[in-house]
């Protein structure tokens, strides 16, 4: 079983913000693979299904970004998942819109959601897919909690299916395969 987690913040006011790109990817994958993400459990909302004949759980933690690790830890403990069976997708301000970066493991890189996950899991050896949301021109909080411009939103709508494909590559094969295929790609 593979856990696919999209990071974001709960609540209408955060929908379609840069910080909620992980939620957007989970919504896309749920629709594409006919997985109902509607069960409130493990401090989140989740659903089970199959991708590439592998059982997956899609999860959107409802703890707010900075406490995401609590939700993931509860689910991972319940299903006895290893860290490398958890894939996390989230926003990255160091990448331009249209770029993504897959990593097998690594530090939080200043992302509080990832910091919470590392603290709660007790390690950093879980694959992650970083989705570029562009660099802030001024205030970081306003940037990540702000909505995309109309032009950027149209661009991100082209990016989300590619992010989904990168995650499926990890599910099917592994993070290295996905890294080779998707790192460095610029989605126009």
Curated annotation (Swiss-Prot):
Q: What is its EC number?
A: 3.1.1.29
What's one GO-annotated cellular component?
cytoplasm
Output the GO biological process annotations, alphabetical, semicolon-separated. Answer: protein quality control for misfolded or incompletely synthesized proteins; rescue of stalled ribosome
Q: Which InterPro entries match?
A: Pept_tRNA_hydro (IPR001328), Pept_tRNA_hydro_CS (IPR018171), Pept_tRNA_hydro_sf (IPR036416)
The record's annotation in PROSITE patterns points to: PEPT_TRNA_HYDROL_1, PEPT_TRNA_HYDROL_2
Per its UniProt record, what Pfam families does this chain match?
A: Pept_tRNA_hydro
- Any idea which GO molecular function terms this record carries? peptidyl-tRNA hydrolase activity; tRNA binding
Q: Does the keyword Zinc apply?
A: no
Q: Does the keyword Iron apply?
A: no
The UniProt site entry described as Stabilizes the basic form of H active site to accept a proton is assigned to 91
What residues sit in the active site?
A: 19 (proton acceptor)
Q: Which reaction does it catalyse?
A: an N-acyl-L-alpha-aminoacyl-tRNA + H2O = an N-acyl-L-amino acid + a tRNA + H(+)
Stored CDD domains: PTH
Where in the cell?
A: Cytoplasm
Binding positions for tRNA per the UniProt entry = 14, 64, 66, 112
UniProt site positions, description: Discriminates between blocked and unblocked aminoacyl-tRNA: 9
Q: Which family does it belong to?
A: Belongs to the PTH family.
- Assembly mode: Monomer.
Q: What is this protein called?
A: Peptidyl-tRNA hydrolase
Q: Which organism was this protein described from?
A: Clostridium perfringens (strain 13 / Type A)
């Amino acid at each position: 079983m593979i856990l696919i987690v999209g990071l974001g913040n709960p609540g209408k006011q955060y929908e379609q913000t840069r910080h909620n790109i992980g939620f957007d990817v989970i919504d896309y994958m749920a629709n594409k693979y006919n997985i109902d993400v509607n069960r409130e459990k493990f401090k989140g909302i989740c659903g089970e299904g199959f991708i590439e004949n592998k059982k997956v759980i899609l999860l959107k933690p409802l703890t707010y970004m900075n406490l995401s690790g609590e939700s993931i830890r509860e689910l991972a403990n319940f299903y006895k998942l290893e860290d490398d069976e958890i894939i996390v997708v989230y926003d990255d301000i160091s990448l331009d819109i249209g770029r993504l970066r897959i990593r097998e493991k690594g530090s939080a890189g200043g992302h509080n959601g990832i910091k919470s996950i590392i603290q709660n899991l007790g390690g950093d050896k879980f694959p992650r897919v970083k989705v570029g949301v562009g660099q802030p021109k001024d205030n970081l909080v306003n940037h990540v909690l702000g909505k995309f411009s109309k032009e950027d939103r149209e661009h991100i709508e082209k990016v989300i299916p590619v992010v989904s494909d990168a995650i499926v590559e990890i599910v099917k094969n592994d993070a290295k395969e996905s890294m080779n295929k998707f790192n460095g790609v610029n989605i126009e």
